[in-house]
Amino acid sequence: IHRVLWLRTLEIAFFVTVFCFLMAYPIAHLLATLPMKYSNLLMICVLLPFWTSLLVRTASWMILLQQQGVVNDFFVGIGLVADDNRPEMMYNKTGSYVAMTQILLPFMVLPLYSVMKTISPSLMRAGKSLGGTPFVAFWKVYFPLTIPGIGAGCLLVFILAIGYYITPALVGGASGTLISNQIAFHMKSTLDWSFASAMGLMLLSGVLVIYWLYNKIVGIDNIKLG
């Protein structure tokens, strides 16, 4: 059972990191390229979740994702699902994915933005003037320059996600909980502190291994946090 829990923890942390990257990249690009007054407004929206308690944000997702919640009402309203066939998005992996992605999104946006802000717009224009299409110029010129920010954001989000506790405990249910929830269970319910400590040490060791692998493959000196 613990092997399944470890695999689920890695799976959820991986997909949350992927979802955060897919959402954060265009947001960070807008922050870096929009005029100052609009980018400042967008930055406020990105940082706004930090001004709210994590518990409050998680509780808000519990209200939004329930079967009679706002998200399902919206899906029914646009005809995506039938009213009598509303999907269950609470107490499963879906709830963990959605809530954790929203909560951890700023930790991906900020490293990407700090790198994109230093990239000169003239580089893209030069790529286009040399005969490249906008996509080729982006892929060959712009994207490689953002890799340090991608590495920093992915490493930060993955490490935070792999040890997350409150959000999976409230919205994940039995199929969306992580190893940290099991550690807390043994600490508070079974009082098996030695086993909980061993699991915590394994979690810490796993994080250090991930950090070591990243350093070997990419190089920790290439990380850009701003």
Question: Which role fits each region the language model picked out?
Answer:
Residues 169-216:
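Interhelical loop and adjacent transmembrane-helix boundary motif
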Residues 51-58:
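Transmembrane alpha-helices and adjacent helix-loop boundaries
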Residues 1-17, 34, 86, 189-190:
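Periplasmic/extracellular loop-to-transmembrane helix junction in inner-membrane transport proteins
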Residues 102, 107-121, 128, 132-163:
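Transmembrane alpha-helices
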Residues 58-101, 135, 171-175:
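Membrane-interfacial helix termini and adjacent extracytoplasmic/periplasmic loops
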Residues 34-42, 71, 122, 134, ...:
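Membrane-helix interface segments
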